[in-house]
């Protein structure tokens, strides 16, 4: 399958290449002006591609040959419904979207996740001071330094990791480093263990149903396939 992609170099382009352990595929994800392009293929396939800049027409060009069974998708950003929260396979993309687009997203799920900021402020105090002075997130190694900072927390309290990641993503969007947001969102969402994702989803459901005043860190015999806790949609659970 031959392909040829040409994009105006003056447009905003975010690209991410990673190996998905869940799908056992190599994934190339691009975002151009709020449109997502995804290319997925098996890791043992030969892929012959190259990326170049054409100075004559000021465009970035991607050319190559992909296996016949390659999956190519194109999706325009769409609102997320509360029903996705009840599907364990959809929760990870919800978190990735929250981290990636913290400045522009809205809705009850995301508003609930924003309450986790209080945990971060309580633990670290001045967030700007943490990002600018301690972690230096705007430096050339800022993305890697941040990932190293939170990696040991991922298995302890995913609430802190999600909150910090969304806040640093918000910071990068404001400082013209938006290209880092997608890479961070994909990495964090894929690094949080299934048990921690289930714990966070369980407590988020409880909060959205009004059973708790905050998103707690409890996990009372909740099986990931058991959606009884998240079965009813109340007025508090409108579409995002």
UniProtKB/Swiss-Prot annotation:
Induction: Expressed in the early phase of the viral replicative cycle. It comes from the Viruses. It holds the Pfam family Poxv_Bcl-2-like. InterPro entries: Poxvirus_Bcl-2-like, Poxvirus_sf. GO terms for biological process: symbiont-mediated suppression of host cytoplasmic pattern recognition receptor signaling pathway via inhibition of IRF3 activity; symbiont-mediated suppression of host NF-kappaB cascade. Keywords: Early protein, Host-virus interaction, Inhibition of host innate immune response by virus, Inhibition of host IRF3 by virus, Inhibition of host NF-kappa-B by virus, Inhibition of host RLR pathway by virus, Viral immunoevasion. Belongs to the orthopoxvirus OPG176 family. BCL2-like protein which disrupts the host immune response by inhibiting the TLR4 signaling pathway leading to NF-kappa-B activation. Acts close to the plasma membrane and targets several host TIR-domain containing adapter proteins including MYD88, TIRAP, TRIF and TICAM2. In turn, blocks the host NF-kappa-B and TRIF-mediated IRF3 activation. Tetramer. Interacts with host MYD88, TRF4, TICAM2 and MAL. This is Protein OPG176. It comes from Monkeypox virus.
């Amino acid at each position: 399958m031959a392909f040829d992609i040409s994009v105006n170099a003056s447009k905003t382009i975010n690209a991410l290449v990673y190996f998905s352990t869940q799908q056992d595929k190599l994934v190339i994800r691009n975002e151009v002006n709020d449109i997502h392009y995804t290319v997925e293929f098996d890791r043992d396939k030969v892929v012959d591609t190259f990326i170049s800049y054409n100075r004559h027409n000021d465009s970035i060009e991607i050319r190559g040959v992909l296996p016949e069974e390659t999956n190519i998708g194109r999706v325009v950003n769409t609102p997320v419904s509360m029903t996705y929260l009840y599907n364990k396979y959809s929760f990870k993309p919800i978190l990735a979207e929250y981290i990636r687009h913290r400045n522009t997203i809205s809705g009850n799920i995301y508003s609930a996740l924003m309450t986790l900021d209080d945990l971060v402020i309580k633990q670290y105090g001045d967030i700007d001071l943490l990002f600018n002075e301690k972690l230096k997130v705007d430096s050339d190694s800022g993305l890697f330094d941040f990932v190293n900072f939170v990696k040991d927390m991922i298995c302890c309290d995913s609430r802190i990791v999600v909150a910090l990641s969304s806040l640093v993503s918000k910071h990068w969007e404001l400082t013209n480093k938006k290209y880092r947001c997608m890479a961070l969102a994909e990495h964090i969402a894929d690094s949080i263990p299934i048990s921690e994702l289930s714990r966070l989803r369980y407590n988020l459901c409880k909060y959205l149903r009004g059973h708790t005043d905050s998103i707690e860190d409890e996990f009372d015999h909740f099986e990931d396939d058991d959606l009884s806790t998240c079965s009813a949609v109340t007025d508090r659970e409108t579409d995002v």
